[in-house]
From Swiss-Prot:
Gene that specifies this protein: gcvT
EC numbers: 2.1.2.10
Entry's family note: Belongs to the GcvT family.
An individual GO BP term: glycine decarboxylation via glycine cleavage system
Protein name (record): Aminomethyltransferase
A cellular component annotation (GO) from this entry: cytosol
Lineage: Bacteria, Pseudomonadati, Pseudomonadota, Betaproteobacteria, Burkholderiales
Amino acid sequence: MTLQHTPLNAIHRSLGARMVDFGGWDMPVNYGSQIEEHHAVRRDAGIFDVSHMCVVDLTGARVRDFLRGLLANNIDKLQTPGKALYTCMLNPKGGVIDDLIVYFFREDWFRLVVNAGTAPTDIEWITAQNAAAGTGVAITPRRSDNNAGAEPLGIVAVQGPNARAKAYAALPGTQAVGEALKPFNAGFATIDGVGEIMVARTGYTGEDGFELVVPAAQIAGVWERLLQAGVRPCGLGARDTLRLEAGMNLYGQDMDEHVSPLDAGLAWTVDLQSERDFNGKAALAANGQRDQFVGLLLRDKGGVLRAHQKVITAAGDGEITSGTFSPSLSQSIALARLPKDVAIGADVQVEIRDRRLTATVVKLPFVRNGKALVS
């Protein structure tokens, strides 16, 4: 199978990145040291190419009506232009088709950012739902592989305690917009030599920063300017350890179409209180929450917590969904789905190869804004 390339592929290779197949995309896993890249984001500023993710513009007079039924979170929370919302898109059984961010810019224009591997099926699902609802929404993917004639867009994420300041230095024109943005808000800035870009105060690391949506033809110049300002290039390896420390789900690993958001720690993204109906609402109401989604800290030596390891508790067995060695905490951590009756602070046993090692159940996240929240 031929791998897809982002507009920054040649630059990654010129920087000596180790490239891997990530959901059919040729992506950098690191540029030499995953640990150093991780620490750069926690302590200073790092940049990630996330152009494999897909921007989808939804336009038309009835977009809001359409999204009321498509998304589990309540789109009516978005009343101020630029405001963003994290939500799941569910199937009729209440399983997660994808998790995404939706931005509101005008009553006739909302923007979704969906995951890389799910983008084709997401677009098929959205198209089918639009046809069934008769809402007449125009659906315009903006990724380079499926933009249907619209200008393709790329995305870079600049993350870390110094990310915003370095972005302002690298890209004059972003400061006036960026300083006015609260978290989970976005605006547009015009950059000399680049044109208009979207500046979103969002991320997937547990640190402050921006995600910049840039015309694909200009994104290499934006990347180079940020590197010149002292932002370190970071790969998918560091992105994974950062998001895991921040207690953030990874689609396909921590949840999928067979998992309810209520069992994936995402109840806060589901609005069951409003009168509106949405895909999966009846199933969620009928089934309720069956499991809890928590963190694990490995106490014993001699192993690393990894996905699919069995967790043995007094209330029954659970499973690790994501696990790693935490560079910030210098110990192994995991996200796990456990029976609801297991208490925070309880010790559990994790099967690692032919051994059972002790881990402690903790509330997520492990790390946020450079600070350890567990011990």
